[in-house]
A protein has these predicted regions:
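Helix-to-loop junction immediately C-terminal to a conserved catalytic motif
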Residues: 48
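Conserved ABC transporter NBD signature motif
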Residues: 56-64, 73
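Conserved signature/switch motifs of ABC ATPase nucleotide-binding domains
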Residues: 152
């Protein structure tokens, strides 16, 4: 469960968010819709403490977000950015392995799950695992970003325009993969 209680964010004299109250139950999908600059990305960044509210509190499972250890919080949160943030010096497989490695998975577990998820998103591991991000299209990079976010089975998945670089067919395929991953 995630809950925003009277959350606000101000930069100097400008209110970015004002008195936001929101309740999201476990297992619930929630979409923030609004015009550019309305605070959607800001709200997402607050959940994993990339930004801190100036007023109010955000809770996860009835505990204030700011009371969580940042590493613990971020390991339990998958995050897909609109601007894909793959490490350029790492291969696709190495990018995907980051969270599982931090969680103590074995190399075999990581390789098996990486191969499975790459295949599910239409990027066969035999063909893509050893590539660098510079060798991928924007849509392929976006799919890798989604695989990296879901491989560790996060409690919360935050997505900021995750399908913007994808065609309609790839978008539908990824939506199915995401729904199956969180059943």
């Amino acid at each position: 469960m995630i809950e925003y209680k009277h959350v606000a964010l101000r930069y100097t004299d400008k209110n970015i968010l004002k008195d936001v109250n929101l309740h999201i139950e476990d297992g619930e999908f929630m979409v923030l819709v609004g015009p550019s600059g309305s605070g959607k990305t800001t709200m997402i960044k607050m959940i994993n403490r990339l930004l801190e509210p100036t007023d109010g509190n955000i809770y996860m499972d009835e505990k204030r977000i700011k009371d969580y250890d940042e590493r613990e919080l971020r390991l339990s949160t998958g995050y897909v950015l609109q601007a894909i943030a793959l490490f350029p010096n790492l291969t696709v497989a190495e990018n995907i392995a980051l969270i599982p490695e931090m969680k103590g998975w074995t190399k075999e577990q990581i390789a098996s799950k990486t191969d499975e998820l790459l295949d599910k998103v239409g990027l066969p591991a035999a063909e893509y695992a050893k590539r660098k991000p510079s060798e991928l299209s924007g849509g392929e990079q976006q799919r890798i970003g989604i695989v990296r976010a879901i491989i560790g089975k996060p409690k919360i998945l935050l997505m900021d325009e995750p399908f913007s670089a994808l065609d309609a067919i790839s978008r539908k395929q990824l939506q199915r993969v995401l729904l199956q991953s969180f059943k």
